[in-house]
């Protein structure tokens, strides 16, 4: 596709930590967090004026789905806006709880973590969405994309400590562990069980194959990748989306890339994640063995050739290719200094290793099983800008930024220049008019005027037939609403 729509859905971990007496269950914490949303929108599943969606997912996991984005810059801003929106809600909830909104004052902290595994070992996801053409052979595309997704974690994993070590090599028991504290590339790799499936929780595949394009089904399909880690660093998210987009473009244009049939996707994911040298091997059905480094170098070489032949289709392509190259070189050499301000797993590893080194220099035992290290691992993913370890690193200049100052804050209310603009204009107009409405990714409906329901099947379109008529209707209602509230003096 010459142009592509992108989106990311991020689930967040939620925890309430009291300063004294008083506890909140996860359900009560979620209810406190979403109270302003429920008060304003009468629901905990809402589309926002910025075009994105805010909702409470299964298991009381707060989730933000970005609006449809037509560029990586829009996507980075939208994803970060979701973090800021939830951070705002958490601060509001804390004030309400302290004021006694639950019947008694509760003094504590409401934490939201942009990670993928909680303390009980439950996993929650970061789902990527890529619009593709309906003309493609979907199953063939999946088969060719799988080797890339299995090995991509060495580039864009969020990193994770394992106090009891990783799984025993070759073991099929998910509870097995080596007993040696360790660090892995990925948080999600230990929780994925197959290549493709219609399930998102029971089987946890790399790719969710449910056919829900949220667009004209005769033209488009949605590639729904659900095995990725949630990223904090903007360069890591950029590389994740840009590299996957390039691979999809190569496959769409039938550009020659590797085609590997992996014997066991779960085993390959785990072996790769827990080997920071990048040399752990996985087997293919033809009896050959490959490493993540070798496979990713093949994709990178192909991407460079593709860009040389077809040209760069956005201004981040050269940076993405360079970061891709530097990350593979860093893994091969074992020297992460060239990427430890851009790639999440390397940024966090540098932070944790520095603490371990200081503790040991002071004569204190420390490793990846230490309580303080586990705390730092979690604190890296805290989304509160004032409290987060990650954001402290950003303020110190230890993490590279991609977005210009203010872009994410603006994206809390401003939609991307896609179909999201239609949704935003409709929502703002309906709110101003005091009209009840129902919105999803494709439909815009005024509950009192169902005959004016808009069907927006083109995710690229910023306008559609009937939109201006509905907006004019709502503007008239808004004027009536205002005149009724503030009648002119006699």
Swiss-Prot record:
Nucleotide-binding in keyword set: yes
The protein's enzyme class: ligase
Keyword Transcription regulation: no
E.C. number(s) listed in UniProt: 6.3.1.19
Pathway participation: Protein degradation; proteasomal Pup-dependent pathway; Protein modification; protein pupylation
Annotated binding of ATP, by residue: 53, 66, 441
Catalytic activity: ATP + [prokaryotic ubiquitin-like protein]-L-glutamate + [protein]-L-lysine = ADP + phosphate + N(6)-([prokaryotic ubiquitin-like protein]-gamma-L-glutamyl)-[protein]-L-lysine
Residues where Mg(2+) binds: 9, 55, 63
Chain residue ranges for the region called Disordered: 160-181
Any one GO biological process: modification-dependent protein catabolic process
Catalytic site positions: 57
Keywords on record: ATP-binding, Ligase, Magnesium, Metal-binding, Nucleotide-binding, Ubl conjugation pathway
Molecular function in Gene Ontology: ATP binding; ligase activity, forming carbon-nitrogen bonds; magnesium ion binding; ubiquitin-like protein transferase activity
InterPro entries assigned to the protein according to its UniProt record, in alphabetical order: Pup_ligase (IPR022279), Pup_ligase/deamidase (IPR004347)
NCBIfam families (alphabetical): pupylate_PafA (TIGR03686)
Other comments on record: The reaction mechanism probably proceeds via the activation of Pup by phosphorylation of its C-terminal glutamate, which is then subject to nucleophilic attack by the substrate lysine, resulting in an isopeptide bond and the release of phosphate as a good leaving group.
Family of this protein: Belongs to the Pup ligase/Pup deamidase family. Pup-conjugating enzyme subfamily.
Known function: Catalyzes the covalent attachment of the prokaryotic ubiquitin-like protein modifier Pup to the proteasomal substrate proteins, thereby targeting them for proteasomal degradation. This tagging system is termed pupylation. The ligation reaction involves the side-chain carboxylate of the C-terminal glutamate of Pup and the side-chain amino group of a substrate lysine.
Name by which UniProt lists this protein: Pup--protein ligase
Source organism of the structure: Rothia mucilaginosa (strain DY-18)
